[in-house]
Regions:
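Surface loop/turn motifs at the tips and blade-to-blade linkers of beta-strand repeat domains
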Residues: 35-38, 85-88, 99-102, 151-156, ...
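Beta-rich catalytic cores
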Residues: 41, 67, 106, 129, ...
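A short helix->beta-strand "capping" segment at the edge of beta-propeller domains
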Residues: 18-41, 94-95, 145
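Beta-strand-rich domains and repeat architectures in extracellular enzymes and scaffolds
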Residues: 34-70
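Residue-level detector of Asp-centered blade-edge/turn motifs that repeat once per structural unit
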Residues: 48-51, 113-118, 165-168, 226-227
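Short, conserved, GDST-rich strand-edge loop motifs in beta-rich repeat architectures
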Residues: 56-69, 124-125, 173-194
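Blade-loop segments of beta-propeller domains
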Residues: 69-116
């Protein structure tokens, strides 16, 4: 309820600044955009290793709501939305204390990387039935298949947003705000640009640590440079995207 209500308020007020917009509910292309419908709240996208498919995170909801989402892909050749099959094996990549509670999920940010062992790893910020990072091995042929390789439970009261993987299987993740924040405190933070979250680092041996000097107003998207020396972090409320030096 909190996240959905907040977005409704934000878009209501921001709509007064729109000069014009095109109606796309009929899924008709225009001179600028080719429109593809049939997706549920597409939240994040990632190009597959073959560059012939786009992995799509279909957001559901945040707890205590119970609307689940999906992981699907968009075939760039056929221009069709396709399901992704998931097989479940032992927890090898995640936290040993994390267990699979439900095969359904509510995905948010995603990231894909070729690990040091040559396997493709897909990490998914997941909000249901509890706040976790879900870790999958991705296998691409004519379709995309996933093998569940583990999960990591989020720190208490944290709502994650987006994730950036390292080749060793560790990752950085943005915490956008705490789950116990009130709706109006979040609205106030968006107006006065006050800090609501930070970036966490997770490694298999030591778990989560807050990354110093990353606190900001609604940390949102995150990406890691190919040499793993820099993070690119977006702070939604402040309208900033920063380059963060991991070596300093």
């Amino acid at each position: 309820m909190l996240y959905e209500l907040f977005l409704t308020i934000v878009f209501f007020f921001s709509s007064f600044g729109f000069n014009e917009f095109n109606e796309i509910s009929t899924c008709n292309d225009d001179e600028v955009f080719e429109i593809f419908c049939g997706f549920q709240n597409p939240e994040d996208l990632y190009l597959s290793p073959s560059k012939r498919k786009i992995i799509v995170s279909e957001f559901g909801s945040l707890a205590p709501n119970t609307k689940f989402g999906n992981l699907v892909y968009f075939d760039l050749k056929t221009k069709k939305r396709e399901p992704i099959s998931i097989n479940y094996e032992a927890n090898q990549w995640g936290d040993d204390t994390c267990s699979l509670e439900d095969k359904r999920l509510s995905p948010h940010g995603i990231d894909l990387i070729e690990r040091n062992d040559g396997k493709y790893m897909l990490a998914v910020v997941n909000h249901l039935p509890r706040e976790t990072i879900e870790l999958f091995e991705l296998i691409e042929t004519d379709t995309i298949e996933l093998i569940w390789r583990g999960c990591v439970d989020a720190p208490q009261n944290k709502y994650f947003n987006d994730i950036a993987l390292k080749k060793d299987g560790s990752f950085y993740v943005t915490s956008m705000f705490d789950s116990n924040i009130s709706e109006w405190s979040l609205v106030s933070a968006s107006i006065f640009i006050s800090n609501t979250g930070e970036v966490f680092y997770w490694g298999k041996e030591n778990g989560f640590d807050v990354l110093s000097n990353t606190s900001g107003s609604f940390p949102n998207g995150i990406d890691l440079s190919s040499d793993e020396k820099f993070l690119y972090i977006n702070y939604w409320f402040s309208g900033l995207t920063v380059k963060f030096n991991l070596l300093e």
